[in-house]
């Protein structure tokens, strides 16, 4: 509890006296519920006092009943061998379903599908392992020269306007600087590529 200074306490008392402010009464911790005597004053109105019947049988009445002829329930003979017991499937007796027929599938019938699935799975694992994304541009390898030439033409057409110097020595693109490849250069590159591959293989085999 914070201890106030003497002058501060006097100032607060003077302010309360001037403005006629009374301290709030302390709230009781527990509400005074009173007693429950009033509940039992008129209890006779709700219960029949004239009804003197015994709610529970007395010991004497039980003795008189016991002296009489006792009736025994005859046990029925039941053959338990007639019961058809089967193990429960976990659904309960009322919710049991008939067994579904199992369809057998030959592995040869779905061999192509399994092979394609395994191939796709291996591709996905390779991409996930080496963080390789799918190529955005697909070029068919049927006719390499024509496809590359058409691809270069489309790239030239879709490229943004480039800036060339007066002498025409340099070719500068707005996005990135790259060398300008012509059709003849691409054809020469494709014709020289198999020779390079063959020489590389020959050196490797030696």
From Swiss-Prot:
GO terms for cellular component: cytosol; nucleus. Keywords: Cytoplasm, Nucleus. Its main location: cytoplasm. It is found in: Cytoplasm; Nucleus. Residues 128-206 are annotated as: Disordered. It comes from the Eukaryota. This is Uncharacterized protein C1919.07.
